[in-house]
Amino acid sequence: MKIYFSGIGGVGIGPLAQIAHYAGHEVTGSDRESSLLTENLKKQGISFDIGSQNGTFLKRSNETKPIDWFVYTAALPQNHPELVEARNLGLKTAKRDELLSKIISDKKLKLIAIAGTHGKTSTTALTTWIFKKLNIPISYSIGSTISFGDSGFYNKDSDFFVYECDEFDRNFLHFNPFLSVITSVDYDHPDTYPTKEDYANAFKEFIEKSENTVAWEDQMPSIYLGQRNVNLLQCESDINPDITLPGEHNRKNATLVVAGLTDVGIINKNNYADAISAVNSFPGADRRFERLLPNLYTDYGHHPIEIKATLNMAKEIAQKNNQDIVLVYQPHQNIRQHNIKKDYSNQFLNASKIYWLPTYLSREDPSLTILTPNELTENIINKENIIFAELNDELWVKLQEDLNHGALVVGMGAGSIDKWLRQKS
């Protein structure tokens, strides 16, 4: 089967292209610009086009050999030239998870789904790492680059597939998981779910589609229906004391994974010690409190709960060296800011200095006014520590001064801040 991936270098589409390649399909595609993923795809012998994405390469590829599937991300506009051309050519068009669901079904794999508002990527990477360290063949897809393998991989000897099941655009409802690990349920993606009830009901449906589920009880009161095979852990008593990862949120997510894998028999008394050793040696995933330089970190977090969790983890590290914490924060999506503005309050208390950037705009509702930094920060308790800034050379000079004075600097956001920090460092 020949599959064309539009946006082949993205963190959602790129790993799936790798999986399709390893599963024996012919893979090609396009993207606007190169990335770490496109470099990895090139090394694997996959051909694709970098440039305009105006439909010309797609048409030429289809003339060379007919394309069976045109796969795209839910973020692709319906009037995108490639999507329009694919429909003009009469190609089967599908979003990412429709194809992945087919591959999982065709290969008769048991899906281990990592879902939830926060921590999906790190937890998916951790679960994959555990399988690898236990020498259990595994197929997987991770929404980030990792240091211990490709972002997406199909192993013909595996019985299981580990996947980051994203709730955006209701993508996770394409699947019927063998095991679902739900890290958290905090209202997000207002462009998909107009109300909190819509969001909760989607997770309710997801649980109903899962054979086994593990989650924290305090995250589930509004969506738990009392289905069988749902393991609800207690926050106060059930955090695994053998897990020593930095960051309480990481320890909680790892506890869920170990509990879930134990529930379905993958972890048992014979390999428990090795599994815990794997957890505690986990190297992390890119853009998840990833160190770029000594004392300079980049993190994907862009929700108040994620901000607080990451700064708590930064505090654990900074306290050992008596360091100040400097945060560079880029809010993500104006439509999201309209929904979470009221929640910005005490999440920033661990930062002695906060450089607040303009909101990164993506998939916006044109009817909404753009919230200013002043409007977004009016309820923050320590707003006297906030400095409004732009991603420019002046900011980088200030960050270098902070680093030279021994501060721990964290850049947070899902937009352009990560790329900017990498270029500067």
Features from the language model and the residues they span:
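C-terminal helical cap/extension that packs against the catalytic core
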Residues: 44, 345-405
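Nucleotide phosphate-binding/pyrophosphate-handling subdomain across enzymes
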Residues: 2, 12, 19, 108, ...
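P-loop/Walker A phosphate-binding loop and immediately adjacent motor/lid segment at beta-alpha junctions
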Residues: 91, 209-211, 228, 311-321, ...
